[in-house]
């Protein structure tokens, strides 16, 4: 009789606590794993109105302001030209996340010479020109 009670109590405890798949990672309610995919690109604004520009994990551009709450529950705590501080939630670890501004640089475009540009425009030959137009 005692074994049946313990077995019944064990089964009831399992049902009440909910079984989870041990091979599945725990659910990320705070979406902390997404933080590394987002980028703070910079800010624009004049006076008191400051708008931050961020890129999310799906490469979608978003405009945010201080104290905005994003759809995943994160809150924009501080917005400066170089840093965006984000609150992830009270029960989340870490409770705050800091992004430093990151701009995209295109090294190939920045290092291209004018001869390369002339070559594309003239159909493959770099045109020589001088002051008299010849």
Curated annotation (Swiss-Prot):
Region feature Disordered, mapped onto this chain: 95-134
Comp. bias (Basic and acidic residues): 109-134
Lineage top rank: taxon: Bacteria
Pfam families attached to this UniProt entry: HofP
Biological processes, Gene Ontology terms: carbon utilization; DNA catabolic process
Phenotype upon gene inactivation: Mutants are unable to use DNA as a sole carbon and energy source and show decreased competitive fitness when cocultured with wild-type cells.
Biological role stated in the UniProt entry: Required for the use of extracellular DNA as a nutrient.
Protein name: DNA utilization protein HofP
Organism field: Escherichia coli (strain K12)
